[in-house]
C-alpha cells in the first residue's frame, strides 16, 4: 500500500485499536458497578468517571492530545452519588480536574488546605444555578522542545469564545543535553535516544500567533476569527483575561 491507501489503512487500524480500548474500559467499569450493586454499596459510593484529557481521532489533522482544541481540552466527567445527585441530571458549568480533591474533602466533611487549588463541585450537584462560579478556564502547554515538537501555547476559554496564543523561540534542540533521563524499558526511551543520536535540531521558526474561535457558532474550531473585521472588542477582552491568568499564576512567557 502507498499514498492515500496506506494512510487509510493506518487510520483504520488506529481507530480499531482505540475502540478496543474503549470497549475494555466499558467492560471493566461495568464489572465494578455490578460489584457495587451486588454488595449494596452503590447508594453510599461516589463514582467519578473522567480522564486527564480528551483525544484527537483525526480532527484538525491530529492524533494524540496536547493542543487546546476542544477534542483534547474538553474532558469527560460523569459523577454518580445517589444521595446528592439526581440520575440523568446535567451541569454545564466550567469545571477542572483540580476541583476533584476539594470535592472529595468537602463530601468527607474535611476542610480544603489553603495551598490546594480548585473548588468543590458539591454546590453543582443540586442542578441549580450557582452564584460566583468561574466563567472561564486557562490552559497552558509548555513542554517544548520535546520529541512531540508541539509548540508552546496557552489560552483562555469562556462560555462562547476561545483565544489561543502559540509563542516561543524556534530552532532549538529537540532533546537538550541532560534534560531527559531515559528510563530503560519505557516506550519513549527509544525515541529520546534516537533523537540524541542524530543530534536532531528543529527547523521551527520563532512564533507569536493567535487563534480565536466562536465556540457557539463554530464548535469544531475550523474558522480562526483573530484579526477579522468586527472581532476587535472580543480580542481585547480575551487578551485581557489571558493576561490576568498569566499574572495570577505567575506564568513565564
Q: At which residue positions do the language-model features occur?
A:
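Polar, surface-exposed loop/tail segments
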Residues: 42-45, 87-156, 231-241, 253
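Histidine-centered active-site microenvironments of extracellular/periplasmic hydrolases
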Residues: 34-87, 96, 117
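Long, internal low-complexity/basic segments
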Residues: 1-13, 21, 25, 193-211, ...
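A long, amphipathic alpha-helix that forms part
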Residues: 3-45, 107
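Short beta-strand segments
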Residues: 46-51, 78-79, 136-142, 164-165
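Beta-strand elements within well-structured catalytic alpha/beta cores of enzymes
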Residues: 18, 22-25, 29, 46-51, ...
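C-terminal, low-complexity/hydrophilic appendages and adjacent surface loops
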Residues: 70-73, 143-227
